[in-house]
Amino acid sequence: MASPSKTGECGDGEEIEALDSVHVDTLLKAVENAGQKSGCTIRIFEKNDFYYFFQSDADLAASFTYGSTAALKTMGKKTPVSFCVMNYSNFESLLRHLLLVRAFRVEIFKFLAGKGGSVPSYQLEVRASPGNISAIEHILYGEGGEGEQGASESNFLVAIKVIPGTDSGQLSLGLAAVDVSLNVVRVADLQDNQHLPALEAILVQLGPREVLLPQTESAAVKKISELVSRNKILGTERPSKEFSSLSETEINRMFSSKSNTSELVKSDSLSCGALSSVCKFLNIDTATTSTKFYLEPLSSSTTMRLTGRTMKSLNVFPSPTNPNQPSIFSILNQTRSPGGGRLLSQWLKTPLLDSVMIKERLNLVELMVTNTEMRQLLWEDHLRKFPDFQRLSAKFGSSKATLQDMYKVYVAVAKLEGLISCLQDHNGEEADNFVTLQDNFIKDLQEANKDFEKFQQMVETTLDLKQVEQGHFMIRPGRSQ
């Protein structure tokens, strides 16, 4: 049994919490009470920022964190159980690896001290999966939601509802993709054949880490499950009843007034049933939610259809297990912000087919490449303080934004006039270049600059900007909260 009184070591001399006999018994009982689990689920037991892993989970944790299983210890007298323990810093790295690279599900149990004569215990506090990371996003990406690893990626959770068609081999599919970190929903109703080329193209386009499928013995669902697995995506079965459609009232409550929900509310919309499944999985109460989502179109008809094998053979993106591997994305990714990284990723996943759109995009790229002065000004000055607006917008929409988030937006908005002037002064000699810049950037930036005038005034009269310079984000004295 582990030492009952002394602080021990794990891995490379890492100090771990002392284990007494009472805590050992509590841990072993918690492991037993947690019951059976799948091989794709990792259970973690936390007390005072120390994290315990048992049996096969301990093998995996020790191998990743310490490079071998030599760090494993055992606890228990009658039936010794192998375990591994680590501090928060190592847990943070391991959690990213488990969810973002290995696509495991994670359950975290929190220690509860006994009160009023009750015995201490462990209680399930967090259940996360690759497509449901909102509860631990601050660990994966940092408190600001803009950590380097993964911040430039979308994190869509996808659900698929399927009905076999009348023609042999034809399928009717409804797909819903939700990214709660961006408050974005994308839906599609499509017809596909038994080889599922249209579905695979959309999955490549979205790049989800997890897909929800109805729990059924249907041959069609089995084929979709095989496709999901082949593309290294975690497939999760959910009860078929969760795929029942949302009501029109629920849809209107869920989406912003700018979202066109006319197709979604149709009675024959399979994507509405898929969206219902995602909402239930993410615990989004569609009857009472105050968070407003943005509905975006999802289609593969205007872009080249790519398969997972094509993306891999062309080495478009680095392997999740080897992020430093050279790839097309890593060569091209000289973006200044996480939002820019997401846009580049989307461009690579969805090559255009329309010649007019291709020409416009190439004109933009050529303008940036040939105009060195403008490119350097944008990179070194105007875009330097730009935060991840999409994630911040979602935080404001969910009433989770802090004073620091407000200040980040304020600083970025203050740079808009200079950014607009830079684009206007360096639009090139050709008229087409000016029109392209106007339509793609300048008009929208001018509109945003005007819209944020009152926001700037509010920040200047509400935040104590002198304290902000010292790193303290506070309301001005005399102002109400």
Language-model segment annotations:
Residues 383-481:
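Charged, amphipathic alpha-helical segments characteristic of ABC-type P-loop ATPases involved
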Residues 352, 376, 403-406:
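Heptad-repeat register of long alpha-helical coiled-coils used for dimerization/oligomerization
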Residues 353-355, 416:
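A short structural micro-motif
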Residues 1-349, 356-373, 381, 388-394, ...:
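Basic, polar low-complexity surface loops/patches
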